[in-house]
Structure formats: structure tokens, C-alpha cells
């Protein structure tokens, strides 16, 4: 499929052909959901912790004698049913990460790119270069292109002025092409690719 290439000023700068093997798949939500779940589980901190009955600071002595009180036969006040006792089966510090085959991850990225193209939410820019590191000027250029909520993917290196100017614009993320991922594609409205990013993606999935 051919898309018109735009400049930051909003002018046309030719056309680019997008590969059907990357951008032309019928999006499968199940594969995309698997990749997003894998990404979010991998970044989860996992530092949750509740003290069990062996860890709470409380006496280990028997609460009261075994017989003669008419009450239930309790021993430790650390048992979960008591106020101040340990939590039964509480959260422990652990990693939430799980495995996902590389082929499924790659397929998920292609399906996410295809979903964006199908929704007509991909814009290809000629180059990501700013003359000066001024947020106001770049924000104006983005507004004229309709980029109020966007993920911008550049080549292997993002030009420094562009990176500095873009980092204070709300709801706009800028990543090099090697950082492209399914979750960030889906959480932003528009996906903006530089010509270098398109070439790198086609080389990657060749």
C-alpha cells in the first residue's frame, strides 16, 4: 500500500510503499493481547509483600491454657484469623515475567502495525529534524499535522534537537526504531514513522 510522505511543515514529499507482509495483515486481537500482557507483566515491579504468621512480630506463647476455659483450642496469636496475625497466602516478592516465543512477539508487532494502518492512523514523515530545540515550534508543527496524541518512531538515532523539543509535549512519545513495541503503539492515537523507520522495519521483517 502506498502512503503520502509528509514534511513537518505539512507539505507532500513523495510516496512510500508499505509492505503487505508487515502492514497488510488482518489484525488478530488475541495475538496483540498476548504481547501486551507479556510486556506489562515483564515491567511489573513485583515488590508486593505481606507478612505471614512466621514473620509477624508477636509472642509465640500459647494464648491461654488448652482446657477449662470453654473457649476454642487456640495456640498462636499469630494465626491469620486474629487481629495482628499473619496474612494467609499473602503476596510475596516475585517476578511476574513469563515467556513468550520470539515469533509471537514479532507477529504481534506486525499485527499492531497492520491495525494502525487499517484504522488510517499511520503518518509517514520525511525526516525527524528540528532546526532548534524549541518545544513551542515543534508543538505547533505537530498541531498542524493533527498530532495531539502520537507515538513517533525515528531511525536508529533520534536527532538531538528534535528529541529535546519533543520531550515536553504531552501525550507524544518519541522512540528510535529499535524501541518500537506493541503496547506503546496501541496506547497512543497516531503512529508516526519516519522514512528511515519504515526502511528499518522492512529490513527487520524481511
From Swiss-Prot:
Biased composition regions of type Basic residues, renumbered to the chain: 64-77
GO cellular component terms, semicolon-separated: ribonucleoprotein complex; ribosome
Keyword RNA-binding: yes
Recorded GO MF terms: rRNA binding; structural constituent of ribosome
Single Gene Ontology BP annotation: translation
rRNA processing in keyword set: no
Disordered as annotated region, ranges: 63-93
Keywords: Ribonucleoprotein, Ribosomal protein, RNA-binding, rRNA-binding
Listed InterPro entries: Ribosomal_uL4, Ribosomal_uL4-like, Ribosomal_uL4_dom_sf
HAMAP family documented for this protein: Ribosomal_uL4_B
Quaternary structure annotation from Swiss-Prot or TrEMBL: Part of the 50S ribosomal subunit.
Function: One of the primary rRNA binding proteins, this protein initially binds near the 5'-end of the 23S rRNA. It is important during the early stages of 50S assembly. It makes multiple contacts with different domains of the 23S rRNA in the assembled 50S subunit and ribosome.
Family: Belongs to the universal ribosomal protein uL4 family.
The protein's name in its UniProt record: Large ribosomal subunit protein uL4
Organism, as annotated: Sinorhizobium fredii (strain NBRC 101917 / NGR234)
Amino acid at each position: 500500500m502506498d502512503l503520502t510522505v509528509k514534511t513537518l511543515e505539512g507539505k507532500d514529499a513523495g510516496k512510500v510503499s508499505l509492505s503487505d507482509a508487515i502492514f497488510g495483515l488482518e489484525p488478530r486481537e488475541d495475538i496483540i493481547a498476548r504481547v501486551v500482557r507479556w510486556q506489562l507483566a515483564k515491567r511489573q515491579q513485583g515488590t508486593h509483600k505481606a507478612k505471614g504468621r512466621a514473620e509477624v512480630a508477636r509472642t509465640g506463647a500459647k494464648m491461654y491454657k488448652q482446657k477449662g476455659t470453654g473457649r476454642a483450642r487456640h495456640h498462636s496469636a499469630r494465626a491469620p484469623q486474629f487481629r495482628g496475625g499473619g496474612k494467609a497466602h499473602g503476596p510475596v516478592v516475585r517476578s511476574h515475567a513469563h515467556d513468550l516465543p520470539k515469533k509471537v512477539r514479532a507477529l504481534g508487532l506486525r499485527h499492531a502495525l497492520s491495525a494502525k494502518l487499517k484504522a488510517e492512523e499511520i503518518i509517514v514523515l520525511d525526516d525527524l529534524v528540528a532546526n532548534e530545540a524549541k518545544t513551542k515550534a515543534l508543538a505547533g508543527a505537530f498541531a498542524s499535522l493533527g498530532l495531539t496524541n502520537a507515538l513517533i518512531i525515528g531511525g536508529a538515532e533520534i536527532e538531538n534537537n528534535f528529541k529535546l523539543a519533543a520531550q515536553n509535549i504531552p501525550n507524544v512519545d518519541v522512540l528510535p526504531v529499535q524501541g518500537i513495541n506493541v503496547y506503546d503503539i496501541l496506547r497512543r492515537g497516531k503512529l508516526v514513522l519516519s522514512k528511515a523507520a519504515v526502511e528499518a522495519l522492512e529490513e527487520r521483517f524481511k
